[in-house]
Amino acid sequence: NKKTFLNINSSIKKVEKKIGFKISNNQKTIEYSPLALEYLKNISKKISDKKGALLIIDYGYLEDSMKDTLMAIKKHTISNLFKEFKNSDITYKLNFKLLKKITNILKLKCQGITTQRNFLLNLGIQQRAEIISRNLPFSRKADIYYRLKRLIDKNQMGELFKVMLITDKRINFNLGF
């Protein structure tokens, strides 16, 4: 019962037809989730029908060119994908620029894309931490600030995670962006 990974070669034309726009010929890697694209199409209908929104917070990147980001995570650490795949979370980083292009094709509006750090700082997370920790013992304050640092530090989740707000075209909302 040996498990293997398959590298499925697909025609760029097929991928372009699925995502709805032409991909640069200079791309060495095309990484996207067809299932995620289907989910986004279904969600977009609900967003349009209900004048709703979708807030995405995930690790990803903002560059135009696609990257090979497939990885395995075990106990909060990147592990060897081929040796640890049974005991790891297999994941990849979202290409937020690709997601924005798809959002436009689906006739939705991207209200903003930013880092988790900027989003939380713009929403006043530091002031909130000060308020809730004001009368707490030192150990509880330290815990709050330790967790805050993890969320907004550039070397931790602050820059790795991105935040994107997708809404119906009739909505204007930029809080946090």
Regions from the language model: what does each represent?
Residues 15-177:
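Long, Lys/Arg- and hydrophobic-enriched amphipathic alpha-helices
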Residues 1-11, 17-19:
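Short phosphate-coordinating micro-motif centered on Lys-Gly-acidic
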